[in-house]
Amino acid sequence: MKNNKPICFYDIYCFKPQECFKRNDINLLEDKLKRYSKITFLRNKENPEIIFLLGGDGSFINFINQQWKKNVKIVGINYGQLGFYSSYDSIKTINLDEIIDENMYYNPLLLKVSINNQNFFYCLNELSLFSNELVSFDISINDYPYEKFRGSGLLFVTPSGSTGKNKTAFGPIIFNNHENFIMTEIFPVNHLKYSSLNAPVVFRKDYKISLTNIKFKKSFSVAIDGNIINFSDKINDIKVETIQASSKIHGLNNFKKYIDKLNKSFIKGE
């Protein structure tokens, strides 16, 4: 009998091979896909439509930062602690009806960072600019002067990154289906002669932030999603804007699951 079911090509990436082997998760997932009645799933490493990522948030972030230009759907199965980018905590809990639902996928917002107008970086979570001593920036919003900041540094975060360092710095949490980004000041200097706004600012996704006249004494670090970027040249200016990834993340726009993760990770009841 001819198989008239639609075909979906997929692949599986496991970032913790020993854990995958111990759980037998790859075999369990492949078996689950084979038994699904509505679609024929075929593994295709060269050109998958769906990629199942087995790992923690760190592995997920690194993967997206490298593969964001590819038009592929990504489903996360959590092997870490928080699992903010994962839709499921185990193979057993995977709902294949949700996997094939186009409405369950969302193109995440990324930060596009340019340094000295020649070095370009992309981050799913956050850009951290930090110094153990005093650092100062002239900040412009859409090429209009905003303020001169003096303090330990600045954080720029996407909605999906707002529960990280930004939360620790008392920045706002933004739900993933809101297309904004945040600038949060880190330990700003405030006294009688000088003070900055000393409050997080939420920007629309089409805003562009420029940092110029960057001054610091000895050390100044630039971190893209936790990865320190080293520069041999002097940093004269930094520009931050956003782009939409071509890749789609499963469940990222599901506010009910997001609230459940917030409760599980941060909120304690009686």
From Swiss-Prot:
GO terms for molecular function: ATP binding; metal ion binding; NAD binding; NAD+ kinase activity. It comes from the Bacteria. Involved in the regulation of the intracellular balance of NAD and NADP, and is a key enzyme in the biosynthesis of NADP. Catalyzes specifically the phosphorylation on 2'-hydroxyl of the adenosine moiety of NAD to yield NADP. It catalyses: NAD(+) + ATP = ADP + NADP(+) + H(+). The keyword NADP applies. This is NAD kinase. The active site is at D57 (proton acceptor). It is found in: Cytoplasm. Keywords: ATP-binding, Cytoplasm, Kinase, NAD, NADP, Nucleotide-binding, Transferase. It comes from Ureaplasma parvum serovar 3 (strain ATCC 700970). NAD(+) binds at D57, G58, N125, E126, R150, N227. Pfam families: NAD_kinase_C. Its EC number is 2.7.1.23. PANTHER family: NAD KINASE (PTHR20275:SF0). InterPro entries: ATP-NAD_kinase_N (IPR017438), ATP-NAD_kinase_PpnK-typ_C (IPR017437), NAD/diacylglycerol_kinase_sf (IPR016064), NADK (IPR002504). It is an enzyme of class 2 (transferase). Belongs to the NAD kinase family. Its cofactor is a divalent metal cation. GO terms for biological process: NAD metabolic process; NADP biosynthetic process. The gene is nadK. GO terms for cellular component: cytoplasm. The keyword Transmembrane helix does not apply.
